[in-house]
Amino acid sequence: GHGEQDIGQYDRHKYIFGACAGAAMYKREIFYELGGFDEDFFAYYEDVDMSFRMQIAGYKCYYNPKAVCYHKRGATTKTMTGFETMLCEKNLIAVRLKNYPFLTLLKCSPYFIIVRIKRYYNFLTKHSSSLFMSAVKGYFKGLLEIPKSLRKRKFIQKSRTVSSEYLENILK
């Protein structure tokens, strides 16, 4: 709900896809069973990756509206930096390759590419050429790490206890 007006949409307990690591609590044994945070990520999308792996293994994430957490967004990098942009682009490729059901990944790839093109255009027109170059650098780093991501995918998908349809529905 970051940046959204609170009109009561967050007042109910419910299951959600996952939580920001800055506000999440994980059962220790499950966290370690699934390999903890991917050390190749350093920052950005590590929580999305963990949420995916938990969902794939059949674990649920529960939202409690009474829980309060203060998370200083951007504390790692104060403003959108080239380093942050590069990490986001690189890690997003890994998250998708490691976790998305194969057919969903194929089906969504054209959309992912269009969104990337729009994002890069936005960097060029509304930000700076250095952010654009950082995004491109991150994208190519992500492409270079495809073999590593595919090896991790093999391990992750072995723990899968839910159907592709379940994952597709929870991603909507």
Question: Which sequence ranges carry the predicted segments?
Answer:
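Acidic/His-rich active-site region of diverse nucleotide-sugar glycosyltransferases
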Residues: 1-42, 48, 57
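Glycine-rich phosphate/pyrophosphate-binding loop
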Residues: 5-16, 150-172
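A cytosolic small-molecule/anion-sensing beta-strand core signal
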Residues: 20, 52, 65
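Alpha-helical architecture
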Residues: 36, 44-45, 69, 114
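Short active-site alpha-helical segment characteristic of glycosyltransferases
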Residues: 49-53, 69
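Active-site-adjacent helix/loop segment of glycosyltransferases
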Residues: 57-153, 159, 164
